[in-house]
Amino acid sequence: MAKKLTIPLELKHDFSFKGYTKTMIGFLYVIREKFGAAAALECIDRLFNMEDRVKNLTNTLLTIFKIKGNDTEAILDFLNVWWELTEIEGTWPERSKTMSRIKITKCPWKTVYKDISDWALSWFNIVTKTINPKATVERPKGMCAGNPYCEYVFKLEE
């Protein structure tokens, strides 16, 4: 009988979620290259039913990781978890309860978002509104537009 392997949790994560992310990136890249940005956006919408799934994902991760609050710091706490899951890298140059700013310097989705980068902004908007319907997000800079990083600003009017 073969000896049972014990796979560390972090390695399981790398094989599952990160592998899934990379598979989806490749899939959407091929769709976009062969059929154009509109087809890639339609695939994203049909495959992911984005709004419902992102809301569900956000609420699930908020619960699992015990992220409390509904201010812009809670949004960044959520994004910190998300970045760990998806290999996104960046910094938080500004962080407060009413206004926070992030800079994404490494994004595995960058090649896919080349001409469908509004999808990323939509994703951030759904996450933001799920955490607090009164919060807003804007993207003053994006890598897909030739900038060295994506910048997102989260605001909560008092």
Where are these regions (language model features)?
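N-terminal accessory segment detector
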Residues: 1-99, 107-119, 123, 129-149, ...
